[in-house]
């Protein structure tokens, strides 16, 4: 799974979201840090969301094994983006609003496309390190890969075989 870093606007917290299965996953403790709330508050909101039927636990929760600092393995529950957003609406914190805004644009684009581009930053580096040339080189490398090339040839062949010769 990929890790996506989300930094809160106040800069006080950096949350590591686990990207897997077209969504992201967090524990209750990570949600508490994200929304600047207590773990008990997050747990209560999740309990109410499940009891009210707003969320189905089988669809939004999965078990995961993690290794703690002491070397022991522990079972933890992870909650997907649907659960994270639902809790964020109930917590009603400024951080919840910020995260929902970010998740509905940047995160959604990453989960769908596999990448996100900061168009404004790429157009105007303003003294920051400029990675535009690196990005172009990576795109050239992807476009030149054999697999992509042969896929395009197969697409052209399929298209040409659709034409009637008469």
Name the predicted role of every residue range.
Residues 1-166:
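Basic, low-complexity intrinsically disordered segments
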């Amino acid at each position: 799974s990929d890790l996506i870093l989300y930094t809160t606007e106040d800069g006080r917290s950096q949350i590591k979201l686990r990207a897997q299965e077209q969504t992201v996953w967090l524990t209750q403790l990570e949600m508490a840090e994200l929304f600047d709330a207590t773990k008990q508050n997050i747990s209560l909101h999740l309990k109410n969301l499940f009891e009210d039927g707003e969320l189905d636990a089988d669809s939004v929760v999965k078990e995961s094994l993690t290794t703690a600092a002491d070397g022991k393995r522990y079972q933890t529950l992870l909650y997907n983006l649907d659960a994270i957003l639902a809790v964020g609406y109930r917590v009603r914190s400024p951080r919840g609003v910020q995260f929902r805004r970010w998740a509905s644009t940047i995160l959604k684009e990453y989960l769908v496309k596999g990448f996100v581009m900061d168009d404004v930053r790429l157009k105007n580096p303003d003294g920051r390190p400029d990675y535009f040339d690196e990005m172009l080189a990576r795109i050239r490398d992807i476009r030149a890969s054999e697999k992509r090339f042969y896929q395009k040839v197969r697409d052209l062949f399929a298209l040409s075989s659709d034409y009637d010769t008469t």
